[in-house]
C-alpha cells in the first residue's frame, strides 16, 4: 500500500509500541494526522519530557521524577515491609487496593531462561542491598501468577531467606497466567491479606 513517506515512517514508529500491530498503527497515524496541530505538538512534547525526566528511584527502582520516589520518601509508610513486584504498573495496581501501606521494590522483569533473562537482568541485587540494615522484617513477593513469576518468587525466597527476613507470597485468587495489573482491587486486596510464608 502506498503512503507518503512521513506517514509510512509514523506507522513504522507506532508499531514499536507494545500491542500495536500494523493495522492499529495505521489507524492511529491517520487519526493523529486529523488532530489539531497544537494537540499533536502537546503529545510529542509530553512524550519527550516524560522520557527525559522520568528515572529510576535509587531505593525501590520504581519510575519517578524525584529521587527518592514519593512512596520511599513517605515517613507514614511502613518501611519494615517491602512488596516486590515485576513492573512499575504493578505498584499502581497494588496502590489501588488501598490495603497495602508498606514500600515497594520493582524488579523490572522476571526470570525467563528461554528468553535469556537471568538474575543479573532484574533488580534482585538492589533488593538484597536494601535488606542489609536490618530494618526490613517482611518481604512480600507479588510477582505475577505465571511460570516466570513463580520461578522468580521461588528464587528470591531462597536467596533472601537465609538473611533472617520473613518472606511471604500473595495468596491465590489471581488466575494462573494472569498479570497483577489486570486484577481488580478487591481480588488484589484479598490476595495480599491471605499471603503465606514461603
Curated annotation (Swiss-Prot):
Protein keywords: DNA damage, DNA recombination, DNA repair, Metal-binding, Zinc, Zinc-finger
GO biological process: DNA recombination; DNA repair
Zinc finger feature spans (C4-type): 57-72
A molecular function (GO) term: DNA binding
SUPFAM superfamilies assigned to the protein according to its UniProt record, in alphabetical order: Recombination protein RecR
Residue intervals of the Toprim domain: 80-175
Pfam family, one: RecR_ZnF
Keyword ATP-binding carried by entry: no
Highest rank taxon of the organism: Bacteria
Protein purpose: May play a role in DNA repair. It seems to be involved in an RecBC-independent recombinational process of DNA repair. It may act with RecF and RecO.
Family to which the UniProt record says this protein belongs: Belongs to the RecR family.
Database matches in NCBIfam families: recR (TIGR00615)
Protein name, UniProt field: Recombination protein RecR
Annotated organism of origin: Symbiobacterium thermophilum (strain DSM 24528 / JCM 14929 / IAM 14863 / T)
Gene: recR
